[in-house]
Amino acid sequence: MANSIQVREVSAGYGSVQVLDRISLSVSDSETVALLGTNGNGKSTLMKCIMGIVYPSAGRITATIDDVEHDLCGLATEDIVALGISLVPEGRRLFPRLDVEENLLLGAHRRAARAQITRNLAFCFEMFPVLAQRRKQLAGNMSGGEQQMLTLARALMTAPRILLIDEPSVGLSPLLVIHTIDKIRELKERAKLTILMAEQNFHQAIRIADRGYVIVHGRMEYEGRSRDQLADNELVRKLYLGM
């Protein structure tokens, strides 16, 4: 059954400050779409709009979950999660004084997820063996790379159909960035997820993205319908390749 997102002409901001200006994008079933842009251009704000954390001032956001379309605008975040959409936030935002397993179990608050806790936990430990090895270790005592794995796994505990991933490479060493991006690709293939990933690391994002968008100063400036189109675009070369 199909799971997708449509963002149509969305504007949003904080108080009198407008951050997004008539943004449109789509993520089709089982796609990985990269939302590319440097810091401060609105990527995280768009993610928050989809999750009901920030309310758009204009436009429409819909999600198709198991072939049923839902209007997300005006829904509370917990209701959006209950539909089957989960966010991996920038900065990880774990509970540092809880251990690995406790952090994971907190992710299983969606009704469908509660019914599958044992299976979901086993899948997370299979995907991320280091978490199984450290299931009783406090999250605050883990390395940055391990915390990023835990954040991804916690989102999986909600049994999502659609996964939003915000800046997964932030604060990680180059080697850990490669490992994290590889894990996201593996997740997509094994869990059949629809993924929207906001990322400023262009080179890593296009390794796994089916296509992508470039956001500049809150406006969608370019849509690349393939990896090759993204890499060959003049705006992308200027922003990311210094050409």
Locations of regions flagged by a protein language model:
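ABC ATPase NBD Q-loop/coupling interface
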Residues: 60-81, 226-227
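Conserved ABC ATPase signature
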Residues: 138-142
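Helix-to-loop junction immediately C-terminal to a conserved catalytic motif
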Residues: 51
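Conserved structural motif at the start of ABC-family nucleotide-binding domains
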Residues: 5-7, 20
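ABC-type ATPase nucleotide-binding domains, specifically the catalytic core motifs of the NBD
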Residues: 15, 33, 75, 100-119, ...
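Helical segment within the ABC ATPase nucleotide-binding domain
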Residues: 178-192
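The feature captures the beta-strand-to-loop junction immediately N-terminal to the Walker
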Residues: 36-38
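ABC ATPase C-loop
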Residues: 155-156
